[in-house]
Structures are given as structure tokens and as C-alpha cells.
Amino acid sequence: MMKTTIMFMLVVVISLTYSSEEQEVARTYCGAHLANTLADLCFGVEKRSGAQYAPYFWTRQYLGSRGKRGVVDECCFRPCTLDVLLSYCG
């Protein structure tokens, strides 16, 4: 009985630790902290060529509200994840 309880507790602790490592925390990034984080994340990310950009009329039609906001709106005025910051690279 005691071994089963210990084993169960061990499994619970390991699963909680593993799941918390996978969750990405949303944070606010402003000013120099935002600039430095973007520089670190985007270092080595290749810039997109002009051919990879969609035509202007297509982007305006399908970007929706995100096309009107910038990285400061998304990551300084409210928390964002590193994945959102990475979307601004290139």
C-alpha cells in the first residue's frame, strides 16, 4: 500500500513538472527589453524576399485586426508569448 502511494505521488509530481515546462508564459515586453528580446529571438532568422510577400490587396483583406496592430500593441500593452514575438522576425 505504501509503495503504491509513493509511486502515485511520484507520477503526479513528474507529470506536473513536465506539463508546466511545456506551457509558455505570456509576458509584457516594453522599451529596451522588447528590442533586446526581439534582437535575440530574430538573430539568424532569414529575411523574407519580396516574392514571399502577398500582394497588397490580399494582405489588407485577410490580415484583419492584427494587420493594424504592431508588436508594441501586442506585447507591451498586454502580455504575449515568445511565439507571437517570433512572428515579427524577418
Curated annotation (Swiss-Prot):
Keywords: Cleavage on pair of basic residues, Disulfide bond, Hormone, Secreted, Signal. Brain peptide responsible for activation of prothoracic glands to produce ecdysone in insects. Residues 49-67 form a propeptide. The gene is BBXB3. Disulfide bonds join C30-C76, C42-C89, C75-C80. Heterodimer of a B chain and an A chain linked by two disulfide bonds. The keyword RNA-binding does not apply. Silk worm has two kinds of PTTH: 4K-PTTH and 22K-PTTH; there are many forms of 4K-PTTH. Its main location: secreted. This is Bombyxin B-3. It comes from Bombyx mori (Silk moth).
